[in-house]
Amino acid sequence: MNIWLSMLTTTGLGAIIGGFTNHLAIKMLFRPHRPMYIGKFQVPFTPGLIPKRRDELAVQLGKMVVEHLLTPEGIGKKLTNEEFQKGLIHWAQVEVDKVMTNEQSLRNMLEKWNVAHVEKEVTEKIEQVITEKIQAFLEEYYTYTWEQALPHSVHEKIESAIPNVSAFILGRATQFFESEEGKTRLSKMIDDFFASRGTLLNLVGMFLGNVSVVDRVQPEVIKFLGQDGTKQLLTDVLQKEWEKLKGRDVKEVETFVEKEMIVSSILSAVKVEETVSKFLNQSVQQVCEPVRETMIEKVVPSAVTKVLKWGAKNVESILNKLHLAEIVQQEVSTFSTERLEDLVLSITKNELKMITYLGALLGGMIGIVQGLLLLFLK
């Protein structure tokens, strides 16, 4: 009975010692968190292994992530995976479609994105661009003559239109002098003519009478305006003036209209601020609807594919620029010892517990062997 009690005792003690030893060894990986001193003498094995080697652990974790986990080959393979690409394209299409079918106005959406004063800034920018383009255009064209500035087709149209312009002018003049207003105006002109020619012509005017002179002059004026020779004369005059104009510099326009006035007139006609305001008041859906299908079906898949292709090609360079090893190292270095302990234990809790049990099992087995040895020795 004493023999079996001894074996049971040695087995129990061995199990307790083995389990406790392993448990203590595991605890000593993390604890104590700080070095302990007796006077000036530092107690051995303090701090624990992981607190003591935390900086080295951070460096090694950074290297492990870069060299074995997030490798260029692994990421490149993932980026070129067909299923991954399809999934990413589908996700991008859904997200872009959500934005393009949004019923909010552009103004409200931009305000949500903290884009302030967008209307004023866009208006000023557009006006600035228009102003610069107009000024550049005028600077260039002011160095030309009208013959150089106007296209050949415009020259042909103007020259072919001159006879029609002559006919139009003469036709309107004929209509005017045939009207009562024209006759009255002609009568006044005759009065003024005789009034400026002295006493003799006044006597002639009084002798003939004003009305009879108008009645005689009016048909002659109308007859003159209707003659082919008059039309040809006016056409020749207009043609000569056109030839003179072609040889003159466009810059002469500035004598009558300054650049600033031209720019101001064009900006007023364009109504940039009003146009921008109307555009911003439209919903995102209204603005995007004409291009929505093209964007979803063609642009998004093409853009995602090109980005992934570029990423796969340059993944090594991107990872080098990111300095992942340094990021991991810095993050781990900022962990408190308690957090680092919780992190490791959350991953290895079951395994460490099994190590404790294994220590107890081995200790118990050693206790049994010791008991058997004692039995044989007696």
UniProtKB/Swiss-Prot annotation:
It holds the Pfam family DUF445. It is found in: Cell membrane. The chain crosses the membrane at residues 1-21, 357-377. GO terms for cellular component: plasma membrane. InterPro entries: DUF445 (IPR007383), UCP032178 (IPR016991). Its main location: membrane. This is UPF0754 membrane protein BCE_0952. It is a multi-pass membrane protein. Belongs to the UPF0754 family. PANTHER family: UPF0754 MEMBRANE PROTEIN YHEB. Keywords: Cell membrane, Membrane, Transmembrane, Transmembrane helix.
